[in-house]
């Protein structure tokens, strides 16, 4: 199908002091999935909000189904068949599935115009069946997983007879199986002639589900490609204006002596008989599928989990690590997989988030008072070194981009002066430009003699950044590869066997 459903041409949108969109364009064809790619701040979400009527454009034209349109708000866009599923879902948790879908549009009956609950539940059941969802429409949203809530949002879009559905980072909180189910739904929608705008940073998903790709950079339209006629490297170059080789900086240090040695480490039912060495100035990548035991291994080394058998040696000494405090005392640091859930204090400012793991070092033992001035100085210095972009240390951390939030977490741990850093999915949810900055920081750390263990589900990242790569499958270590010689095929072959 090549029928053009939506054309946006010459769209410009200016906010005070910032041109968010500068003469951009987008073409969406019927029954196809268009990826909209670009770094954070490239203008992707702004353009979608212009289409959805949340923002009014300064100039440009929007043609939908051959007619020029200008929606004054979300309600008008929805009624015209344009739906948007936001990254941060906002269901009414104490209301039922049916109530969330039909809110403000409930079927009415009788002269008193009362809500016809029986019809609403029947209609909801029919909607859910279209997505292979066998749920009781009376179920409160609070009892659903994030993935199921997302399916309810898609059901809601279908209830409007949507011809265009915008999905903003739809898989950010989904497991592998949940992603598979979402993609099955998208394929069904395509067959029904529905068009999808798919905003994501995840290259593997883009090439798996999208037909066409449009790239923005700094509020400008860079180009459009058919997914089958482009590749990862070209898209990175389009998004950041430089080649992939520049994204992964070369090693700055030659690995030195053994700093960490793990011998026959096991946790029953989780991973078994894991042994490896980590050297000074080295990045050791750990690859594997979801459920391979990678995160659990790092949690055990950091004292979050207790191991059943095995030994941990640091600088030639057999050590006992039973708690994270033990790990920190042995100069270890751990950037967790989900920074928003288990790393950041979102209601606090940058200063509090940076200093919180190292308060005792600034405590006057005699009068039990914190030296706040020294804390502020050191926190600001560390954030400056790591190039955290912020108006000041008093800025709420929730206002920062994902890349800058990750830098603040890194600054927090650098105050503890670690020698070994465990990085679990260090660039998850951040754009290509911010990833490049994180990679440079990782190389800076190895240049200082720090030892890094990196877990990543992105194979180009594992191969581009690792000196050596360990591959896990089903809780077992399947092999080791030299980073500079490894291929994605080799890694995946080990990960699946």
From Swiss-Prot:
CDD domains recorded: ABC_Carb_Monos_I, ABC_Carb_Monos_II
Annotated compartments: Cell inner membrane
Enzyme kind, highest EC tier: translocase
Manganese in keyword set: no
Subunit structure and binding partners: The complex is composed of one ATP-binding protein (MglA), two transmembrane proteins (MglC) and a solute-binding protein (MglB).
A GO cellular-component term linked to this record: plasma membrane
EC number: 7.5.2.11
Xref: PANTHER family: CARBOHYDRATE TRANSPORT ATP-BINDING PROTEIN MG119-RELATED, GALACTOSE_METHYL GALACTOSIDE IMPORT ATP-BINDING PROTEIN MGLA
Keyword line: ATP-binding, Cell inner membrane, Cell membrane, Membrane, Nucleotide-binding, Repeat, Sugar transport, Translocase, Transport
Membrane topology listed for this record: Peripheral membrane protein
Xref: SUPFAM superfamilies: P-loop containing nucleoside triphosphate hydrolases (SSF52540)
Highest classification ranks of the organism: Bacteria, Pseudomonadati, Pseudomonadota, Gammaproteobacteria, Vibrionales
Function: Part of the ABC transporter complex MglABC involved in galactose/methyl galactoside import. Responsible for energy coupling to the transport system.
Name the UniProt record assigns to this protein: Galactose/methyl galactoside import ATP-binding protein MglA 1
Catalytic activity from the UniProt record: D-galactose(out) + ATP + H2O = D-galactose(in) + ADP + phosphate + H(+); methyl beta-D-galactoside(out) + ATP + H2O = methyl beta-D-galactoside(in) + ADP + phosphate + H(+)
ABC transporter domain boundaries: 6-243, 256-494
A single GO molecular function term of this UniProt record: ATP binding
Binding site for ATP: 38-45
InterPro entries noted in UniProt: AAA+_ATPase, ABC_carbohydrate_import_ATPase, ABC_transporter-like_ATP-bd, ABC_transporter-like_CS, P-loop_NTPase
